[in-house]
Curated annotation (Swiss-Prot):
It holds the Pfam family Ribosomal_L23. This is Large ribosomal subunit protein uL23m. One of its GO terms (molecular function) is structural constituent of ribosome. Component of the mitochondrial ribosome large subunit (39S) which comprises a 16S rRNA and about 50 distinct proteins. It is found in: Mitochondrion. The keyword Mitochondrion applies. The gene is MRPL23. InterPro entries: Nucleotide-bd_a/b_plait_sf, Ribosomal_uL23-like, Ribosomal_uL23/eL15/eS24_sf. Residues 131-153 are annotated as: Disordered.
């Protein structure tokens, strides 16, 4: 699952406790098209296999997995640099994980839509309070005894 795993040397009498950390990073991606509720889409490294992903999710995150399907998404090469040479984005692997029976996943709504009616009233209130504060600030100071503000040090 992990590349270049170096285990510590064996020492007599010492316990062989090992913490296994992977050097794989997976990204949970919002699907572009509608998918069933039990299917989750990930973006994974090219070296990671479907068995690795299944073990990763089951052992580290305790997520029961029914099936894993993968495909390779080729990076686009439409962009060109200052020398008119094509620049290719790197390829990546997309994995579709089907969760076990009864498990569902819905992508969280991180930025909910705001009600425009509530937004407009708060803007009007903020503008009216701002104008009241400005008028109070620009009014004459009673301690100056009628002397204008421009006539000061």
């Amino acid at each position: 699952m992990a590349r270049n795993v170096l285990y510590p040397l064996y020492q007599l009498g010492g316990p062989q406790l090992r913490v296994f950390r992977t050097n794989f990073f997976i990204q949970l991606v919002r699907p572009g098209t509608a998918q069933p509720e039990d299917t989750v889409q990930f973006r994974i490294p090219m070296e990671m296999t479907r068995v690795d992903l299944r073990n990763y999710l089951e052992r580290i995150y305790n997520v029961p997995v029914a099936a894993v399907r993968t495909r390779v998404q080729h990076g686009s090469h439409r962009k060109r640099d200052h020398r008119n040479v094509r620049i290719k984005k790197p390829d990546y692997k997309v994995a579709y994980v089907q969760l076990a029976h009864g498990q569902t996943f819905t992508f969280p709504d991180l930025f909910p839509e705001k009600d425009p009616r509530l937004e407009g009233s708060s803007v009007d209130e903020a503008q009216s309070t701002f104008m009241a504060d400005e008028q109070q600030r620009q009014g004459s100071d009673p301690q100056r005894g009628g002397v204008p503000n421009w006539f000061s040090l």
